[in-house]
């Protein structure tokens, strides 16, 4: 069984992300994951190439993972960190 921590460790060691989010969407059985990866290594690469890089970084884990959803594979310049202000409601009334 692949763990969230294993996926995080492999992506961190191979892609050196400045932002990484891994979510086990299989209910804890380690068969399905969603990932967001922001890495300088994606500079100059098209989206398909970036996805291939993520899959290559998880080569060993992919032998046991049933599904991998790559939600984001962005460069630091493309990535916009979640803003604390976005949760604030404005008063227009």
From Swiss-Prot:
GO MF: 2 iron, 2 sulfur cluster binding
Main location: cytoplasm
Keyword Zinc: no
Transit peptide among keywords: no
Residue ranges of the region described as Disordered: 72-93
Localization (cell): Cytoplasm; Nucleus
Entry GO CC: cytoplasm; cytosol; nucleus; plasma membrane
Alphabetical UniProt keywords: Cytoplasm, Disulfide bond, Glutathionylation, Nucleus
PTM-bearing positions, type S-glutathionyl cysteine: 29
GO biological process per UniProt: intracellular iron ion homeostasis; protein maturation; response to iron ion; response to oxidative stress
Post-translational modification: Can be either glutathionylated or forming covalent homodimers, depending on the oxidation state.
Family under the similarity heading: Belongs to the bolA/yrbA family.
Complexes and interactors: Homodimer. Interacts in vitro with GRXS14, GRXS15, GRXS16 and GRXS17, but not with GRXC5. Interacts in vivo only with GRXS17.
Comment on protein domains: The putative nucleic acid binding region (34-77) coincides with the interaction surface with glutaredoxin.
Purpose: May act either alone or in interaction with glutaredoxin as a redox-regulated transcriptional regulator, or as a factor regulating Fe-S cluster biogenesis. The GRXS17-BOLA2 heterodimer binds a labile, oxygen sensitive iron-sulfur cluster.
Protein name as catalogued: Protein BOLA2
């Amino acid at each position: 069984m692949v763990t969230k921590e294993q996926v995080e460790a492999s992506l961190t060691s191979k892609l050196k992300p400045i932002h990484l989010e891994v979510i086990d969407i299989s209910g804890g059985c380690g068969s399905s994951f969603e990932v967001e990866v922001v890495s300088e290594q994606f500079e100059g690469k098209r989206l398909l190439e970036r996805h291939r890089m993520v899959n290559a970084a998880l080569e060993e884990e992919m032998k046991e993972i049933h599904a991998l959803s790559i939600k984001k594979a962005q460069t630091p310049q493309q990535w916009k960190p979640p803003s604390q202000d976005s949760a604030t409601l404005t008063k227009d009334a």
